[in-house]
Curated annotation (Swiss-Prot):
<dbReference type="InterPro" id="IPR006418">
    <property type="entry name" value="NMN_Atrans_arc"/>
</dbReference>
<dbReference type="GO" id="GO:0005524">
    <property type="term" value="F:ATP binding"/>
</dbReference>
<keyword id="KW-0963">Cytoplasm</keyword>
<comment type="similarity">
    <text>Belongs to the archaeal NMN adenylyltransferase family.</text>
</comment>
<dbReference type="GO" id="GO:0009435">
    <property type="term" value="P:NAD biosynthetic process"/>
</dbReference>
<keyword id="KW-0520">NAD</keyword>
<keyword id="KW-0547">Nucleotide-binding</keyword>
<dbReference type="InterPro" id="IPR014729">
    <property type="entry name" value="Rossmann-like_a/b/a_fold"/>
</dbReference>
<dbReference type="InterPro" id="IPR004821">
    <property type="entry name" value="Cyt_trans-like"/>
</dbReference>
<dbReference type="Pfam" id="PF01467">
    <property type="entry name" value="CTP_transf_like"/>
</dbReference>
<keyword id="KW-0067">ATP-binding</keyword>
<keyword id="KW-0548">Nucleotidyltransferase</keyword>
<dbReference type="GO" id="GO:0005737">
    <property type="term" value="C:cytoplasm"/>
</dbReference>
<comment type="pathway">
    <text>Cofactor biosynthesis; NAD(+) biosynthesis; NAD(+) from nicotinamide D-ribonucleotide: step 1/1.</text>
</comment>
<dbReference type="GO" id="GO:0000309">
    <property type="term" value="F:nicotinamide-nucleotide adenylyltransferase activity"/>
</dbReference>
<keyword id="KW-0808">Transferase</keyword>
<keyword id="KW-0662">Pyridine nucleotide biosynthesis</keyword>
Length: 171
């Protein structure tokens, strides 16, 4: 059994994230999606709760007909010590044998812990970028709606996530 771990904050889950999940599921038997900064919400950088992010991801994967029996979604709170971060992840996640990431620090930490690193293609990272999407939402730029899966768009509108983000920004 080849099990991969894909960490991210997913604030919000966008089309680039979805493409990484699809790519990953072609390379591993099971996928653990780790929702980082799980304790954070209602801030400019982390506007959505861990539960809301789980909901975004599950709805999207279900809509895409991806086999949810092969996917774990695990929220993990931050720890502010890079030297023990991999051990922290291993405490919360099921066993895995490969990390799926393009983040240089994440890759370095897992390599040092003797975990294989798989780097997915970039999938237009300048376009599909959660920071940009949050900025578009705050500015009222409707382009953000094209950068997230339809299920995420519907969910964010359902929970008034766009209004929340503008309110947090003081608008």
């Amino acid at each position: 059994m080849h099990r991969g771990l894909y960490p991210g904050r997913f604030q919000p889950f966008h089309i680039g994230h979805l493409e990484v999940v699809k790519w990953s599921m072609k390379h591993v038997d099971e996928l653990i999606i780790v929702i980082g900064s799980a304790q954070e919400s209602h801030t400019l950088s982390n506007p959505f709760t861990a539960g809301e992010r789980i909901e975004m991801i599950r709805r999207t994967l279900d809509k895409e007909n991806l086999d949810l029996s092969k996917v774990y979604i695990i929220p993990i709170p931050d720890i502010m010590m890079n030297s023990v971060w991999v051990s922290h992840i291993k405490t919360f996640a099921p066993n895995f044998d490969v990390i799926i990431s393009r983040n240089p620090l994440v890759n370095r930490l897992f390599k040092e812990a003797n975990v294989e690193v798989l780097q997915p293609p970039p999938f237009d990272r300048h376009k599909y970028n959660s920071t940009l999407i949050r900025r578009y939402i705050i500015e009222g730029n409707e382009e953000w709606k094209k950068l997230v899966p339809k299920s995420v768009l519907d969910y964010l509108l359902e929970i008034h996530g766009d209004e929340r983000l503008r309110s947090i920004a003081g608008l």
